[in-house]
Amino acid sequence: MIPFVDAHIHLWDLNHIRYDWLSPPFSDDGPNGSVEPIARNYGVADYREDLARWNVIGAVHVDAGAAAESALRETQWLDTLAAVDGLPTGFVAFAALNDPDVDALLAAQAAHPRVKGIRHIVNWHADPQRTYGPVDLTVDPQWQAGYGLLAKHGLSFDLQCYPGQMPGLVPLIERHPDIPVIINHMGMPVLTDPDGLNDWRRGMKALAALPHVAVKLSGMGFIRRDWTMAGIAPLVHVAIGRCGGDR
């Protein structure tokens, strides 16, 4: 079986760190729908059991949505897991890039050798059922300045946004070729938008033209909660076609 590194996993101990999005009350509203089925502790042993049929030789933990003040605590907890269990092998931690103290936050995260990058979810959409926040942070000069500090600390950026935000992000990402960017969840096309599929195609084309941008084939359920292999395959083919097998 082909060995591979799982590029996007989440672990959590709800008794150790609070995750508001994993706490009741639960609702079908919002971009994630009801998360009640996964609102339980999920550790390395659970992950190994779920992945037993695959030859996983490493796994990258991506920030799991803890409160901002718990971001460093999450990294410290993951370090403990990695030291004992051998997983995760790398971390993409959280830092709010619009925080006035972001330079210190990035330095604190980068002090942990397993931290390779940062994710700050920036999905914004005019539809309140889709948006992750009240404003589009990607157009905020303070957020853009925080983004520019990632290279100073040797960190990549996991980009989770919607296709409508992609064209506006291109100039910023282009100005910083020393910050590797990894598009999360295939760029999260919003198929219910009037021109959602074409918005995604255009956005992915614009970002993929930058050689320091890669994409994860993940998060199919964000695109369609009732996704199937047959239904998602055309989108996977487009993503691979845009970025190539090496990205």
Where are the predicted features?
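Helix-coil boundary/capping segments in enzymes
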Residues: M1-R247
